[in-house]
């Protein structure tokens, strides 16, 4: 039993007798189990420094009694957790029956690495992702964007579209909410229940109003559960994080509270090791795979922010959301020229796909170069060849807009799951000029892949009638 001796911000110095000094990582209980601290550092034979994990109704005061639980974070694991929501301490946040097996956080870390050579493509049904940023099982995907451009909607759509294609007996889905809004977690849970996907999903949530210690530790807790599912249950894991930037932000707050010297842009000096410690665990083993999807908040929409760069270095693919594209009313607002994937290889997606991506990017890049000239002179002043490029680029930009299932409650329009082969056929026809006579606006939010051919046939029919 110890006593709180000093406190500031979310950091507390707690004194114990010499023979009762707790270990680093142990959880301390205060105020009859209403408040919890985690031992971060041992200062002397009798003094430890701890960070706040959970606060009760009353603030922690000097001389408050702290009891060493002699345990670290206990993580609920196993099939019984399907459909359950947990906090960082493993407490159940929703009504869910059953007893849970628990393992200690980080006890599932494996040094064994297994490189997946199967290159199994995961189709998301989202045209712009499946075309520009293909996803394979066991890869890491980052979704970068500033505030309010649709990161959370996209990650919810990915959960919905990918999960419903997989056999729930072979796949386990984890969602880790790191410092985001309570409302978003509640909406996601309701949507998972309504779509019957909750039966293979576990959620670990630390909300934005919780202490920085909780927001930082929730990610290792969620990863521990995912590693257990991969290795002990031999599942293929889909691991979704919203928002991994908040994990690093919480680390920055803790570093400041602990009095550590900051580095570039005010971030903690341990920024690189903090992100490496979690990213390296999101890997495949001989028992199963972990495919991770991570939203990344961009402060001031800056891709060069040190936290964003640190995260980007660990990813196989990155989706970059654009405020300009969002303002044009095109959704998902993904910028295909800024987004990239190391998985866009001929041996993975095929020669035809690679060549089409190169052709489309060439058209979009040329269009971007012409934009300033168009603003000054207008499209009609361009050379005929450039006018053709502009028309194709505008058709392509609109073609990649898509109604999403998770946005249907806002748009009042049903979602659409795109077939990859049909999409490639249509894109090839667009770049070949097969649809060049169709107005650009007709390409917006297309549903069925047959629509463009129908529109073209109707236009040709109208032209013949006018000629006659």
From Swiss-Prot:
Key words, A-Z: ATP synthesis, ATP-binding, Cell membrane, CF(1), Hydrogen ion transport, Ion transport, Membrane, Nucleotide-binding, Translocase, Transport
EC numbers, comma separated: 7.1.2.2
Keyword Cell inner membrane: no
Reaction catalyzed: ATP + H2O + 4 H(+)(in) = ADP + phosphate + 5 H(+)(out)
Superkingdom as given in the UniProt entry: Bacteria
Record-listed ATP binding positions: 145-152
Alphabetized InterPro entries for the sequence: AAA+_ATPase, ATP-synt_VA_C, ATP_synth_F1_bsu, ATPase_a/bsu_AS, ATPase_alpha/beta_chains, ATPase_F1/V1/A1_a/bsu_N_sf, ATPase_F1/V1/A1_a/bsu_nucl-bd, ATPase_F1/V1_b/a_C
Family matches, as Gene3D superfamilies: 2.40.10.170, Bovine Mitochondrial F1-atpase, Atp Synthase Beta Chain, Chain D, domain 3, P-loop containing nucleotide triphosphate hydrolases
A GO term from the CC aspect: proton-transporting ATP synthase complex
Compartment(s) where it occurs, according to its Swiss-Prot or TrEMBL record: Cell membrane
Topology term for the membrane: Peripheral membrane protein
A single GO molecular function term of this UniProt record: ATP hydrolysis activity
HAMAP family linked: ATP_synth_beta_bact (MF_01347)
Quaternary state and interactors: F-type ATPases have 2 components, CF(1) - the catalytic core - and CF(0) - the membrane proton channel. CF(1) has five subunits: alpha(3), beta(3), gamma(1), delta(1), epsilon(1). CF(0) has three main subunits: a(1), b(2) and c(9-12). The alpha and beta chains form an alternating ring which encloses part of the gamma chain. CF(1) is attached to CF(0) by a central stalk formed by the gamma and epsilon chains, while a peripheral stalk is formed by the delta and b chains.
Annotated family: Belongs to the ATPase alpha/beta chains family.
PANTHER family from the UniProt entry: ATP SYNTHASE, ATP SYNTHASE SUBUNIT BETA, MITOCHONDRIAL
Job description of the protein: Produces ATP from ADP in the presence of a proton gradient across the membrane. The catalytic sites are hosted primarily by the beta subunits.
The protein's name: ATP synthase subunit beta 2
The gene coding this protein: atpD2
């Amino acid at each position: 039993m110890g006593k709180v001796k000093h406190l500031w911000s979310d950091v507390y110095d707690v004194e114990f007798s010499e023979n009762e000094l707790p270990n680093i990582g142990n959880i301390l209980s205060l105020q009859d189990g209403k408040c919890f601290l985690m031992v971060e550092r041992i200062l002397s034979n009798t003094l430890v420094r701890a960070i706040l994990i959970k606060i009760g109704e009353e603030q922690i005061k000097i001389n408050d009694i702290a009891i060493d639980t002699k345990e670290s974070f206990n993580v609920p694991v196993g099939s019984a957790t399907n459909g359950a929501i947990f906090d960082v301490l493993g407490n159940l946040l929703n009504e869910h029956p059953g007893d849970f097996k628990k393992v200690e956080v980080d006890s599932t870390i494996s040094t064994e690495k297994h490189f997946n050579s199967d290159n199994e493509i995961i189709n998301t049904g989202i045209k712009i992702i499946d075309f520009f940023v293909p996803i394979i099982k066991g890869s890491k995907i980052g979704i970068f964007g500033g505030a309010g451009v649709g990161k959370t909607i996209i990650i919810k759509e990915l959960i919905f579209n990918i999960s419903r294609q997989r056999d729930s007996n072979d796949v386990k889905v984890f969602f880790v909410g790191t410092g985001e809004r309570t409302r978003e977690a509640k909406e996601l849970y309701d949507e998972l229940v309504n779509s019957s996907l909750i039966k293979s999903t576990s959620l670990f949530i630390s909300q934005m109003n919780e202490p920085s210690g909780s927001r930082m530790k929730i990610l290792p807790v969620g990863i521990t559960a995912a590693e257990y599912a991969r290795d002990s249950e031999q599942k293929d894991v889909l691991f979704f994080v919203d928002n991994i930037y908040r994990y690093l932000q919480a680390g920055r707050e803790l570093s400041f509270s602990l009095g550590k010297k900051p580095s570039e842009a005010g971030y903690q000096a341990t920024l690189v090791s903090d992100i490496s410690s979690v990213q390296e665990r999101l890997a495949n083993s001989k028992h199963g795979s972990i495919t991770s999807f991570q939203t990344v908040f961009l402060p001031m929409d800056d891709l060069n922010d040190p936290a964003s760069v640190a995260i980007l270095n660990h990813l196989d693919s990155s989706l970059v959301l654009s405020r300009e594209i969002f303002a044009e009313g095109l959704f998902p607002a993904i910028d295909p020229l800024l987004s990239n994937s190391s998985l866009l290889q001929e041996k993975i997606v095929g020669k035809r796909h690679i060549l089409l991506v190169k052709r489309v990017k060439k058209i979009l890049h040329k269009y971007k170069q012409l934009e300033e000239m168009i603003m000054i002179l207008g499209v009609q002043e361009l050379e005929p060849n450039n006018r053709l490029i502009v028309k194709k680029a505008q058709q392509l930009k609109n073609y990649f807009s898509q109604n999403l299932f998770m946005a249907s409650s806002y748009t009042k329009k049903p979602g659409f799951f795109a077939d990859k082969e049909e999409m490639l056929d249509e894109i090839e026809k667009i770049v070949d000029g097969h649809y060049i006579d169709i107005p650009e606006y007709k390409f917006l939010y297309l549903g069925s892949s047959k629509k463009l051919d129908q529109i073209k046939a109707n236009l040709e029919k109208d032209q013949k009638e006018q000629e006659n």
